[in-house]
Regions:
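Long, basic/Gly/Ser/Thr-rich N-terminal segments
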Residues: 129, 141-144, 152, 171, ...
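Interdomain "pre-motor" coupling segment immediately N-terminal to P-loop NTPase/helicase cores
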Residues: 168-205
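Phosphate-handling DNA/RNA-contact segment within nucleic-acid enzymes
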Residues: 43-135
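Acidic beta-strand-to-loop metal/phosphate-binding motif
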Residues: 91-93, 133-148, 169
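The Walker A/P-loop phosphate-binding site
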Residues: 202-254
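TOPRIM metal-binding catalytic domain and adjacent DNA-binding surface shared by DnaG-type primases
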Residues: 1-57, 74-89, 131-134, 194-209
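Acidic, metal-coordinating catalytic cores used for nucleic-acid/nucleotide bond scission
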Residues: 119-123, 143-154
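Short, aromatic/basic amphipathic alpha-helical patches
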Residues: 129, 151-162
């Protein structure tokens, strides 16, 4: 991961509160929290969001009861986007902030970002950042394994540059990266990234999967045509085949 500019500007109406602390239950270290500037402020966890020019705009706050609120202004950027360069080898995209932190904890020094509004707004949020993804060679979508996560994966993958998208798959029973790390299985996160499968849209077939079909000779014909030219072109007819003969196109000669 190329070193990024971590200089952040702050308007006067929002400010950091609290301090970086280890998230014991989540198995996320103080160092990871400090890297993302995710601070504990009493009962709140505060996730900073920045504008595209790295000006601090506001915070998403989370309570122990998993209630979320926003302070300051909302932005179009992804969580963690201010920490990453505009180009790179690989970028991981998660549904939630704690998943992104879990990804960094398991696989540090790579680009880990998350959606600002979860799976429901995934397509809209990614659409606003298409220019960012153009700069990366590989885009790993690491969304939750529930139905909402699967739908978001399909919607987002279809938006992103063809040939760059891979889908991360966690083994059961883990539902997301945070769940795996809470169970002390950082290796599952790493393997999900390393073994992410290339995205293949419905109806599109990988040419490599057809190699055997096109390189094997056709089976012998069951019957030969009585027409020499047609026989030479088709090598006869086989059961299950249909040969359609149509007229040429153009102006009628009649």
């Amino acid at each position: 991961l190329t070193r990024a500019d971590h200089t952040h500007h702050m308007p006067t109406n929002v400010q950091f509160k609290g301090s970086a602390q280890r998230l014991q239950k989540r198995r996320i270290s103080e160092e990871t929290c400090q890297h993302y500037k995710v601070y504990r402020d009493g009962e709140l966890l505060r996730f900073p969001y920045y504008s595209s020019d790295k000006t601090l705009q506001g915070f998403k706050t989370k309570t122990k009861l998993k209630d979320f609120k926003y302070e300051g202004n909302t932005t179009d950027t992804l969580f963690g986007q201010s920490l990453i360069p505009s180009t790179g080898k690989r970028i991981m995209v998660y549904e939630g902030e704690l998943d992104a932190l879990s990804g960094w904890e398991a696989y540090p020094n790579w680009a880990h970002v998350s959606l600002p509004h979860g799976a429901a707004s995934a397509k809209k949020d990614i659409q606003k950042q298409l220019q960012l993804f153009q700069g990366y060679e590989e885009i790993v979508l690491f969304f939750d394994k529930d139905e909402a996560g699967k739908m978001a994966t399909e919607a987002v993958a279809a938006l992103l540059p063809s040939g760059k998208v891979k889908i991360a798959h966690l083994p059961d029973p883990y539902k997301d990266a945070s769940d795996a790390l809470q169970n002390n299985d950082a290796e599952a996160i790493r393997k999900a990234i390393w073994n992410a499968s290339p995205y293949q849209p419905d109806g599109i077939v990988d040419g490599k999967s057809l190699l055997e079909l096109v390189t094997n000779p056709s089976p012998p014909c069951d019957f030969e045509y009585p027409f020499a030219g047609l026989q030479q072109m088709t090598h006869g007819i086989r059961y299950g085949e249909l040969t359609v003969i149509s007229a040429g196109t153009g102006l009628s000669l009649i």
